[in-house]
Amino acid sequence: MSKVLFVKANDRPAEQAVSSKMYETFVTTYKEANPNTEITELDLFALDLPYYGNIAISGGYKRSQGMELTAEEEKAVATVDQYLNQFLEADKVVFAFPLWNFTVPAPLITYISYLSQAGKTFKYTANGPEGLAGGKKVVVLGARGSDYSSEQMAPMEMAVNYVTTVLGFWGITNPETVVIEGHNQYPDRSQQIVEEGLENVKKVAAKF
């Protein structure tokens, strides 16, 4: 049985947030098409994960060197391990998030920091880093109110680009991406943009 991991990084309600609506649409469609799949859903805002900083990093370093960890470091390392192992064990993963202030919400950055561990999702080699998680099937769902397709705006899109860059670093070079954009910039076409985007979400979910 396939293990599927759904990761949502938006705590706003679906009636107000397009990426939340994308997430709900994908999960509902996928469950209908795959009733026997083992599914785990992570709501990153609800989890309130501790920031990835000195305690977790020092704990990981000490463990790798066979040094004794403090109780605080043990707890931080165990938290990182929990989510890292969960990700590694998943056959399929879906990320859903908005673009806020040109990038992803902070909880997703924290979560990705947990996952980006040398020897687990990538390794160092003489020729540079090499990804270790390339066997996964991944979908990226992103929403942004402005249209970032122009030459001027594209460099400012650091949400989907950030996530897909990190995935590529881990060896996941072909994630399927569905983006809904411009629904705030083009209010006269907002409903159409969102509806067409959600139809694309359903199509991807049905065959995921």
UniProtKB/Swiss-Prot annotation:
Per its Swiss-Prot or TrEMBL entry, what cofactor is needed?
FMN
Disulphide bond pairs: none
A Pfam family found in this protein is Flavodoxin_2
The alphabetized UniProt keywords are:
Flavoprotein, FMN, NAD, Oxidoreductase
Source domain of life:
Bacteria
Catalysed transformations (reactions): 2 a quinone + NADH + H(+) = 2 a 1,4-benzosemiquinone + NAD(+); N,N-dimethyl-1,4-phenylenediamine + anthranilate + 2 NAD(+) = 2-(4-dimethylaminophenyl)diazenylbenzoate + 2 NADH + 2 H(+)
Q: Which InterPro entries match?
A: Flavodoxin_fold, Flavoprotein-like_sf, FMN-dep_NADH:Q_OxRdtase_AzoR1, NADH:quinone_OxRdtase_FMN_depd
Q: Indicate whether NAD appears among the record's keywords.
A: yes
EC number(s) given by UniProt: 1.6.5.-, 1.7.1.17
Task: Describe cofactor binding as the record notes it.
Answer: Binds 1 FMN per subunit.
What class does this enzyme belong to in the EC scheme? oxidoreductase
Is Chaperone among this UniProt entry's keywords?
no
* Record GO terms (molecular function): electron transfer activity; FMN binding; oxidoreductase activity, acting on NAD(P)H as acceptor; oxidoreductase activity, acting on NAD(P)H, quinone or similar compound as acceptor
Q: Quote the subunit structure annotation.
A: Homodimer.
By its UniProt entry, which HAMAP family does this protein fall under? Azoreductase_type1
Summarize the protein's role. Answer: Quinone reductase that provides resistance to thiol-specific stress caused by electrophilic quinones. Also exhibits azoreductase activity. Catalyzes the reductive cleavage of the azo bond in aromatic azo compounds to the corresponding amines.
Q: Per the similarity annotation, which family is this?
A: Belongs to the azoreductase type 1 family.
User: By what name is this protein known?
Assistant: FMN-dependent NADH:quinone oxidoreductase 2
Record organism: Bacillus anthracis
Identify the coding gene.
azoR2
